[in-house]
Every structure is written in C-alpha cells, then in structure tokens.
C-alpha cells in the first residue's frame, strides 16, 4: 500500500486495477484518487477554464471514471458501438433522450469497466469489444457513447476550427456535391478524428431514418448533438465572462443563465445542421430514380436550401413561449427544490407590471398559492418532472446528474437579491438538449452550458404548461451588463454582416443509397493529410467569415412568440393593402423587412425576422383589429398634392426602436412611380365590388399551422388574449368562463374573408377536405346579445326571420361584411376535436349538424358558414333543433332531405369513429319517455311518402338556382340501404376532445374542466336515439348543402312573413342540408295544418315520428314573392351597403 500511495508516472498494474475495478467508490475515498488525478493532470491537458483549485473541489464531490480520452484509443470503441446502435437503435423510441428509466449508473459503470478495465482510457482488444457491446442494451450503449463523446480532446467531436475551415473551403470550391467526403477530411486533425466524425453523422442519419417510429427527426437530433460536436470556444465572442474565483476577465467561464446557453448552443446547432445536409448530399446521386433514402431524409434535403444562409432555430412552427423566472443571487441553491422555495418566497403578485403576460401571472400565482411550501408545487408537476427532480436531488454514489458545483463571485457591490419574470422561446428539442446537458454521464463543463436552470412541466385541469426556473450570479450579471453597455457605446452601431447572395441555385438533389458503406468510411479517413498539422493559415481569415446568424437582439429574451409572427403574416396575406405593397415593390411591408429567399421552397408562410413583435406588452393586438370597421378605414387620397402620403391607422405592427429607423428609411426609398402605382391600386380596390374579391385562406392556414408542438398545443384564444395566448404555452384565464369573446370576435374576423362565388368555393372545399383542422367557433352557440351584427330575436321572431330569409342567401353573392360572415371551411377528420373555448355549456341550435365539433363536413357545393343566432329557450330547455315551420312534423321528409348514412357511404368514414358521445343532460319530460321508447322499438314507421310524388308539379316560377340544385345530378345519391342498427357517423366525437378524454388535438391530456352538456331522451342509450331517423324512408336524392349554412346569416332587413304563415318549431334531423329543408328530387313540399305548439313541446318532442300533414301552399307563394323581391333588389345593387 505504501507503493500505491506514491504518484505513479504510469498507470497502475493490472493486479492493482483488478482489485479496484469493482469498487470505484472505495477507490475514490482512499489515497488512490489523488494518484489518479495527479497522473491525469500530468499527461492530459487541463480542460479550458479550470484552475487547479477548481479541479480539486470538483473531485471532492463528483465521481469520475476517466477524465479525457484520446481519439486514437477510443476510435475503435466508438465505431463498434455505432455499428451496434445502427442495427438495434432505429426502432427504439426516444433513444437519444436522457433520464430514461432503462438507463442506470450501474449498467453504465459496468460497461465502462469492461471496455476500459485499466481505467486509463485504454480499451480491450477488438474481439472483446464486439463481444461486450453485443451483450449490452441500446440504452447503456448510447449512454456510454455520450460519456466518451464529451471527454474527447477539447470536449468536442468536430470543433469550431475544423468547421470554419470546411465552410471556407466549400464556399471556395462552389459547394461541390460531395463536399463532406472530399473537403471535410482535409479540415480534421487526423484519420482518427475523421473516423469519429464520420461515425457521429452516420449514427444520426441511421437513427433519424426511422423517425416515424422513434420520434426523433434528423433536424432535431442533429441540433441536439451540437453540445458534443462543439465546445464553448466560439470565435469572436462578444462578451467576456468573469472568472468565478479571481474576478479576472476570462473567455471560457461557465454560462450564467439559460440565455447564455442558447447563445452558445444555437450557432453550434446551425453548424451541425449545415454539416448534416452536407453529409446527406454526399450520398445523393445525380439520378433521382436511384435515390433510396427514406422519405423523411428526402424531405430534409428538398425542403432546405444548401448551404443554410440563416439560422433555423426559430423557424419551426412548434416554437413555444413560456415563463422564465430568474433568481439573481450571490448564494446558489444546493438543489432545485431549494430554488423553488426561494422563488416562492420572493415572488410578489401584488405588482402586476412585473409580469410580461397575464398568463404568466395566473400560472405562477396558481403554482405559488401557498407560501413557504413546495408540496403544492410538487403535486402540480407532471410525472416526468417529478422523476427528473428526484434524480437531480438524490445523491448518487457514482455519476451525479444535475447542476455542476459552482460558487458565486464575491458580491463586493452589495447588490440585493431579486427575482424577475421574463419570457423565453423554446422548442421541444431545446428541452431535449437541456436534459442532455444535465445527464448522468456528462462532464461538469457540459452541465454548465445552460447555467443553473430547470425546465419543469406542470398540469392544470388537463393543461400542461412549461416553466423555466433559474438562478444567476447577481454580480456576474451586473458586470456583464456593464461591459455590454460599454461595448455598445464604444462601437458604432453596425448591422450584422450578411453573407453575399451566391450565384448558384439550390438543386433538388436526388437521394441516395445508405451512407453506411465501409468503403466510404475508409476513404473518408484516407482523405486526411498524413501530417497531423493541417493547414490552418486560413483560420484567421475564417474568423471574419463565421458569424452568429441569430442576432443579439433576437436573443435578448424579449422576443415575441414566433407563432404570433407567422399568424400576423398570414393575416396580411389576404389583406388587399398588403398585396398592393408587394405589387408596388415598396419595402414598407410590416410583415418583413427582408426579401424572402427565392430558392428556399420551405417556410412559405413564415418570416424569421423578429420585427413582428410588439414592444408595448400591455397593449393587446388583435388579429381582428384590421377588420373592425371602427378602427380600419381607408384614408382620403389626395392625388393632386405633391407630398402624397398614405397613412393607415392600426395597420403597421409596432416595432422596436432599432427597427423603426429601418422602417423609415425603407419608406423614404420608395420611388415616385411606386407611389403612383400604389395610388392607382388603392383607387381600384375602392372601386371594385366586393364580389370581385375572391380571397380564401383555407389553403394558407390550417389548424396545425396555428398551434404548437403536439404535446402542448395552446387553446383557441379570445380577442383580448390573442397576443399572450398565441405567444405562450399558458392559456387564457377565460377558458372556464361562459363568455363568447372568441366566437363573437371571430365573426368580425371572418367577415371580409370569403366573398367568392359559391361554385368556386365548392372546388376549394373539396380539395381542402382533409384531416387537418382549424379553429373556428361553433357560431350557433353564441347568444344573440353577443352578436353586434345581428338583431336579438325572441323565439317567435327568430322563427319568422329564419323561415323567410334562410333560403335567400344563394342570391346574395356580394353583401357587405357586416351582413355576411363566412368562417373558414372546416377540415376536421372524424374524431378531430375543438377547443373548449368553443364548447360551451349551452347546446347547439342545430342539434346534429355536421359541425367541426361533432363530425366532418363532406365535400359540398359551398364552403361552410355560420347560421342565424337564436336566443335560448325560456322554458328551461336548451334549443337543440333548427327552427321549423308550424306543423312541419314529418320526420319522413326530414330523412328524405338528409340521409346520414348516405353521407357516410360516400365519404368512407371509418366505422370505429362512428361513436356517439355520451350526453350528460337527460332533460326530457316524463310524458315523452314512452314515446321515445316506442320510437326506438319501431325504427321503421308505416308512414311512407312516395318519393317521386311531386315531380310533375314543380312550379314553373321557382328560381333557376333552386331548379338547378334540385335537378343537378351531382347532388343525387343512391337510396340508403344501410341497416337501422348502424350508428350515424356524425356522432363520432367520443368526448369532443379525442378518444375517451384522450388524444386532444390541442392539449396532451385532452381533459377539460368545462365539457359541454349534451341532451338525450331518457331511456335511450347514447348510441341509440339517433337511429330512429336513419332509415325511416328511402330517399332518392341528396339535397345540396344549405345556402345559409355556407353564405352566412340572411340580411336582417328583409321583411318577416305574415303571422298566419309562421310555423311552430319541430326538431329537424340536421346534417349538411338541414337549414334549407329542401326536398329530394321530385318531392314537393307539403304544407301542414297542425296548429303551433308551445316551445316546451318543441324541445320535448325530440326525434319523434309524426305523420305528414297537409300542404303549405300559402307559405311557398309568399316565400317566392319575397325571394323575387329581394333578388330584384340585389340585381339593382340596392342590398344595404
């Protein structure tokens, strides 16, 4: 033992190591640990930024198997592990994500001891490596690979010098297709280095080739792996950090916050993405037909320009804005739980201005409701977050995850401890990267990349919210801000250097055979120069070439949510003035200050410029504000004046101060000819009739384009909450209320959208009838009091107006925006869900309509629109049916108009989605129970109406559009022959949010606290009662989709019918054609003579079969007269504008 106590210049003997290998903790506590450390410090260069004292303090607290590996020794081990992972890993879900239950310290330590039995980085021979690796599981193998990666020389796999030299040489040679295989080896230090780099990208491509199974795309995992590919040594570092011990200026001190970590990692992620595309291009042949890459990798090549000119970190549609709580202190917390306790004590909710968003205030206040305790916070965490906190807080005997040990700088300025709440933009793979940096096998240097931050997930009534907590050195933060101010004041304000546009065009590269050929692997190593000293004379010149494409202002953590930028840009697409700007060539467009690259086929609807953000956080910008007639008015254009200007209030988005100068300069650069052209276009826009404007946003926007990444999609928003809801993972506080802000305002929002002809919209609706979804309120649910554009009816008045005017909207192709409201076409597939903002506690006025809340809209002749609004029933029942004339009690006619099963037959909806949602409110008068049960018992009544009864009696004075719709063969469908026992497909929402309260399209859990009640007759099972009307009669033709359903509510100035023509209400089996109540081809409308029934009976007689009654001749004559009169008014241009 005395010999062992001496410093050994060589590794210990095999016998000594064998006795120590099985007890690493014991060896650490004895005098062997200093010997090992002295040996390593003697032979291995100290890692950057570490003093000797820092090494000793860390060795006292951290277990380390081996500090640093040489490339020559571990090249073979990395290659063997990579080959095994390529074979077994692609089918494993989330293989590269740390903190998995399958990963344990014991397994990792056992594998490391087997591969490196001497403990000095010298592996066993190749045969033993193959045998050891083949017996290990993939989780431990990848953990072992990460352990070796972060302990390579300079703690990096590739290195900034190699990348910058590759970038310079590739540009010099005009970006050859095989640039990675031909140029990259010349930029690496040795063949061993080339072997490791090749295996690195080979593993990334192999894992991401099966991303549909393992949920890891090439773009995300390549950027995540940047923390191992590049160390902190970023050229031209703007801000010098302070050393924590001596307060001397050092360039490589640990990062002080998660923002500093993003500043370091995002440029590295962009470099990794560049190299990944170069690696893929090297295996793509010229012949497209011979491409054998998976579709995911093909799309990666075809949808990204090469080389990437700008950062792609914030170009994803899944960017999420979350609260960032920062504790600035001079004493760091020992564990994350202690940080939460300190935040709990310091957060002051009386100061509302301290929170940038109302959602942040509500979320944090609900978290820290009880002071001086973290039990409530722990209960609100998700299961994964609790597991992560437990792993980081538990003391492990070997490898310890979590924050690296660190001390604060002495607070010589006596700065007071404080807390602040900001906002942070992240993506899902940002969290993956943060997790990877804190994993068990990482070094202290990697654990310091994102400072002392913790990203936690909380659950609130089914919602899942992310919050970032971190603590910063208050002295370091103060000094860095002072240095930044000095730097910015000393330097003249210069914009970032942009790479000059290249002449080459991005080819759509054909795709390749598998890049895992040993021939290519050997050739890649052979390309490395024989001398280890690679030419580095171009490195100083490269320093000017490399630039961080994420600007400093873009990373000041005050950015708005990128999703809001994208949404505002899409709104500007249909704005006529935005189109005028594009035609005139002016640079004053508020959506972007830079021209979108023409050779970039992706991100057509997205601009990465940060200028969309609003500087006034307290002012809520609404997407509907530009459509509000009170706020948006065209200015008076004086063309004769010399200083002609157009000032449009509330149109330009607000910008930061530094961007306002650019806006002014761009406006000054507009030429006189462009202004004249703009003047002419504005006049032309004012002269043109509204029906000339054929604008559709169905193709520009889908529901997925407005939501966040799948696990944490925000809810639909209200007008008042637009800015914060779209820019945050935290949802509006109004989710549980019964207000209709979003719905009411969306009527204004969609008022100007669709004034196209019905036939043109039919083509778009057929094309766009896919499984995607878009937020659109269930407008039928709105109370009449919340609709400014529509008068409030009582129940009787609504019947008059509806029966008289509901059929006239086909004639009104061009009405004012205040009269015609057309939401976007619904594109929900069966089972798609809507937000609880739309699902209120009141029922639909149209009971079983084909609304996006319940069923998909089949391809039809028109795009869907809103239906007239009616007040709720005063008798205590919610209005569940469409308003129908008196005596219109014949279910046979209703069924003849709307054969639900025929719809399902045509559109092939899967049967497993035809589930009826269980209803909660069984509100049926007791006297009707027996009638409902009898109706169940006899699903096929005896009252059969002849189908072709009224063919010869078609009135000749029926308007042409009705005759065409009746006789149009496109609307004829085969006779329904389905069995009655088949459930109708349109009741397919299990709980309106997915399958059995799961799979919500907006939130991960799919659980909402405000599930809307449904009504079903007592004694009838949920899947049973709609079947009474499925096959009562066999219709010969299918009616067209009602005009008012697609063209919006009828104008309210049309005179109501006479009182004797007002029919009573009767529930209608409503599908896509229920509002019109048109009859199948050849069936004449029969009038009825039964007196009107009270409103209570209307709701009570729910799907009860009745016999046909009489003929409704007077009503038909009067309606035709009213139609003709209104048609004449419209033709003469007198339609209320």
From Swiss-Prot:
Q: Which InterPro entries match?
A: Msb1/Mug8 (IPR037508), Msb1/Mug8_dom (IPR012965)
Listed under GO cellular component are: cellular bud neck; cellular bud tip; cytoplasm; mitochondrion; plasma membrane
Name the residue ranges with Basic and acidic residues bias.
593-608, 750-769
Task: Note whether Phosphoprotein occurs among the keywords.
Answer: yes
Which residues lie in Polar residues bias regions? Answer: 21-50, 736-749, 770-796
| Region named Disordered | 1-59, 483-520, 577-620, 736-799, 814-871
Q: Which UniProt keywords apply?
A: Phosphoprotein
Query: What biological-process terms (Gene Ontology) are attached?
Result: establishment of cell polarity
Q: Which top-level group of life is the source organism from? A: Eukaryota
Kindly indicate whether the keyword Hydrolase belongs to this entry.
no
Q: Which residues carry this modification: Phosphoserine?
A: 538, 776, 816
PANTHER family reported in the protein's UniProt record: MORPHOGENESIS-RELATED PROTEIN MSB1
Q: Main role?
A: May play a role in polarity establishment and bud formation. The MSB1 gene may be functionally redundant.
User: Any additional notes?
Assistant: Present with 172 molecules/cell in log phase SD medium.
Please state what the protein is called: Morphogenesis-related protein MSB1
- Tell me what organism the protein belongs to: Saccharomyces cerevisiae (strain ATCC 204508 / S288c)
Gene name, per UniProt, is: MSB1
């Amino acid at each position: 033992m005395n010999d062992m106590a001496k410093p050994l210049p060589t590794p210990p003997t095999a016998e000594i190591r064998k006795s120590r290998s099985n007890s690493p903790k014991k060896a650490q506590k004895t005098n062997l640990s200093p010997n090992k450390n002295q040996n390593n410090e003697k032979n291995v260069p100290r890692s950057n930024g570490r003093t000797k004292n820092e090494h000793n303090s860390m060795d006292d607290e951290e277990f380390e198997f081996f500090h640093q590996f040489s490339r020559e020794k571990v090249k073979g081990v990395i290659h063997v592990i990579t080959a095994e992972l390529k074979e077994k890993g692609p089918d494993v879900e989330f293989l590269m994500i740390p903190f998995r239950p399958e990963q344990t310290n014991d397994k990792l330590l056992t594998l490391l001891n087997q591969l490196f039995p001497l403990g000095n980085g010298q592996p066993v021979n190749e045969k033993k490596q193959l045998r050891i690796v083949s017996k290990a599981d993939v989780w431990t193998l990848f953990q072992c690979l990460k352990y070796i990666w972060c302990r390579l020389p300079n703690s990096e796999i590739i290195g900034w010098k190699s990348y910058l030299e590759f970038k310079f040489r590739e540009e010099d040679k005009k970006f050859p297709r095989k640039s990675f295989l031909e140029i990259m080896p010349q930029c690496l230090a040795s063949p061993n280095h080339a072997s490791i780099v090749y295996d690195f990208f080979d593993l990334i491509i192999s894992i991401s080739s099966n991303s549909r199974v393992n949920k890891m795309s090439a773009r995300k995992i390549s950027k995540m792996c940047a923390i191992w590919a590049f160390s902190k040594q970023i050229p031209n570092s703007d801000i010098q950090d302070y050393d924590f011990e001596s307060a001397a200026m050092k360039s490589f001190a640990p990062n002080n916050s998660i923002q500093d970590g993003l500043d370091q990692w995002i440029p590295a992620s962009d470099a990794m993405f560049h190299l990944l595309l170069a690696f893929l291009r090297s295996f793509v042949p010229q012949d497209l037909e011979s491409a054998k890459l998976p579709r995911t990798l093909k799309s990666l090549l075809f949808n990204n320009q090469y080389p990437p000119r700008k950062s792609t970190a914030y170009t994803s549609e899944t960017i999420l804005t979350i609260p960032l709580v920062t504790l600035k202190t001079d004493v760091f917390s020992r564990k994350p739980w202690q940080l939460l306790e300190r935040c709990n004590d310091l957060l002051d909710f009386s100061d509302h201005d301290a929170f940038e968003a109302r959602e942040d205030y509500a979320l944090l206040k609900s978290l820290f409701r009880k002071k001086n305790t973290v039990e409530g916070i722990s209960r609100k965490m998700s299961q994964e977050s609790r597991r992560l906190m437990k792993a980081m807080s538990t003391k492990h005997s070997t490898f310890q995850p979590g924050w690296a040990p660190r001390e604060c700088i002495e607070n010589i300025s006596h700065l007071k401890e404080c807390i602040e709440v900001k906002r942070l933009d992240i993506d899902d793979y940002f969290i993956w990267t943060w997790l990877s940096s804190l994993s068990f096998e990482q070094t202290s240097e990697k654990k310091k990349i994102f400072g002392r931050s913790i990203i936690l997930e909380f659950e609130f009534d089914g919602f899942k919210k992310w919050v970032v907590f971190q603590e910063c050195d208050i002295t370091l933060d103060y000094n860095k801000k002072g240095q930044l101010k000095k730097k910015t004041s000393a330097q003249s304000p210069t914009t970032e250097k942009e790479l000059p546009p290249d002449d080459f065009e991005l080819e759509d590269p054909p795709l390749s055979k598998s890049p895992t050929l040993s021939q290519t692997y050997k050739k890649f190593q052979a390309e490395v120069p024989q001398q280890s000293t690679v030419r580095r004379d171009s490195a100083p010149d490269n320093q000017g070439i490399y630039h961080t494409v994420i600007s400093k202002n873009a990373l000041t953590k005050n950015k708005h949510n990128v999703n809001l930028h994208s949404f505002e840009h899409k709104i500007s697409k249909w704005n006529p003035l935005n189109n005028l700007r594009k035609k005139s060539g002016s640079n004053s467009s508020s959506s972007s200050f830079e021209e979108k690259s023409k050779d970039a086929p992706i991100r057509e609807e997205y601009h990465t410029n940060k200028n969309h953000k609003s500087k006034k956080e307290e002012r809520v910008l609404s997407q509907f504000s530009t459509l509000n007639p009170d706020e948006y008015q065209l200015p008076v254009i004086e063309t004769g004046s010399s200083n002609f200007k157009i000032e449009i209030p509330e149109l330009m988005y607000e910008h930061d101060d530094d961007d306002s100068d650019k806006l002014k300069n761009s406006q000054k650069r507009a030429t006189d000819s462009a202004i004249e052209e703009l003047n002419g276009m504005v006049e032309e826009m004012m002269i043109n009739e509204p029906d000339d404007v054929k604008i559709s946003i169905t193709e520009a926007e889908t529901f997925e384009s407005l939501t966040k990444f799948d696990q944490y999609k925000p809810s639909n928003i209200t007008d008042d909450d637009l800015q914060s809801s779209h820019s945050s993972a935290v949802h509006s506080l109004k989710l549980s209320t019964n207000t209709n802000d979003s719905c009411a305002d969306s009527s204004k929002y969609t008022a100007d959208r669709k004034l196209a002809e019905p036939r043109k919209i039919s083509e778009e609706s057929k094309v766009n009838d896919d499984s995607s979804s878009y937020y659109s309120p269930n407008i039928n649910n709105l109370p009449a009091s919340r609709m400014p554009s529509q008068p409030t009816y009582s129940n009787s008045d609504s019947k008059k107006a509806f029966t008289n005017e509901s059929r006239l909207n086909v004639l009104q192709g061009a009405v004012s925006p205040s009269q015609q409201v057309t939401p976007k076409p619904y594109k929900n597939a069966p089972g798609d869900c809507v937000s609880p903002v739309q699902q209120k506690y009141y029922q639909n006025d149209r009971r079983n309509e084909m609304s996006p809340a319940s069923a998909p809209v089949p391809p039809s002749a028109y795009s869907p629109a809103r239906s007239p609004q009616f007040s709720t029933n005063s008798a205590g029942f919610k209005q569940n049916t469409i308003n129908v004339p008196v005596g219109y009690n014949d279910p046979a006619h209703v069924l003849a108009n709307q054969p639900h099963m025929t719809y399902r037959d045509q559109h092939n909806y899967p049967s497993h989605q035809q589930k009826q949602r269980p209803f909660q409110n069984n509100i049926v008068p007791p006297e009707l129970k027996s009638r409902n049960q009898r109706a169940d018992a006899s699903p096929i009544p005896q009252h059969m109406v002849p189908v072709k009864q009224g063919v010869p009696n078609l009135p000749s004075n029926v308007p042409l559009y009705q005759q065409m719709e009746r006789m149009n063969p496109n609307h004829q469908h085969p006779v329904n022959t389905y069995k009655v026992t088949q459930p109708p497909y349109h009741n397919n929402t299990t709980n309106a949010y997915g399958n059995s309260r799961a799979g919500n399209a907006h939130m991960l859990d799919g659980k909402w606290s405000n599930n809307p009640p449904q009504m079903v007759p007592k004694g009838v099972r949920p899947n049973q009662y709609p079947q009474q009307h499925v096959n009562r009669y066999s219709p010969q033709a299918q009616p067209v989709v009602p005009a008012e359903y697609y063209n919006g509510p009828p104008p309210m100035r049309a005179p109501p019918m006479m009182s004797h023509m007002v029919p009573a209400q009767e529930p209608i089996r409503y599908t896509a054609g229920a509002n019109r109540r048109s009859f199948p081809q050849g069936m004449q409308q029969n009038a009825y003579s039964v007196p009107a029934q009270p409103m209570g009976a209307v709701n009570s007689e729910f799907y009860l079969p009745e016999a046909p009654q009489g003929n409704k001749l007077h009503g038909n004559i009067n309606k035709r007269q009213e139609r003709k009169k209104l048609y004449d008014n419209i033709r003469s241009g007198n339609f209320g504008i």
